[in-house]
Amino acid sequence: MSFRPGARQFFERRGAPLPYDAEVEYLQNTGLTQFINTGIVPDTGFRVNARITPLDVSVGDKWLIGAWNSGARFYPMYMYPVGRWGGGYGGYFQGSTVAVAGTTIEMDVDYTASYQIIKIDGSVVQQFAKSGYSGTSARSVYLFGLNDGSNNVNSFLAQMGATKLWMNGSLVRDFIPVRFANTNNQSEGAMYDRVSGELFRNAGTGAFTIGPDKS
């Protein structure tokens, strides 16, 4: 049986232990070379909700979550221009809400049939018509970066907590950040998906900084 790169499959059985040692507050992309491949290819009807803390807001044209190819572009959590939260779909991008370093927010981005709606802490901050492209991205969404088919994830320094992904109203990923002991008996950070029962490990290089255990 083969497993998706970056994920380890555990079969949920009644009474079986969870495949991690503790849930933690966040993962941090130290060195900007770590990312999680969610395995979800977005299209219209895609939605993502994440608890995030930007640590470097002096950047622009950088991504925290996204997927791209020449046919369709999904930039749900995007720093554009410098120091502002933005989003984009296809050939249109918009940024207006100032990002504050060290401030934790809950960001929700919903791609409806005609609009991209961005909420921060429950309030709509951007809503604009999608234009330029349509259909699926053909590439799966990354957390902590943009999947453009290369190893350059074009991210910025941030912490990410619980993150959920929907497709057409159905919850397809329910990630919580966790730590577990790897085969070298070292503590490793990963995202555990409560929908599939999979542990999604770093698909890049280096290692995530692991936040404190969640109380």
Where in the sequence are the language-model features?
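Enriched but not universal
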Residues: 1-22, 192-215
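Beta-strand-rich, repetitive solenoid scaffolds
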Residues: 4, 66, 76-80, 87, ...
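Short, aromatic/His-centered strand-loop micro-motif at the edge of beta-sheets
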Residues: 84-107
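Flexible glycan-contacting loops in extracellular carbohydrate-active proteins
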Residues: 127-159
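Localized edge beta-strand/strand-to-loop motifs within extracellular or lumenal beta-rich domains
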Residues: 101-119, 168
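Extracellular beta-strand elements of beta-rich domains used
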Residues: 163-165
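Extracellular glycan-recognition modules
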Residues: 19-86, 167-172
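Surface-exposed loop/edge segments in extracytoplasmic proteins
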Residues: 72-74, 91-95, 123-128, 170-174
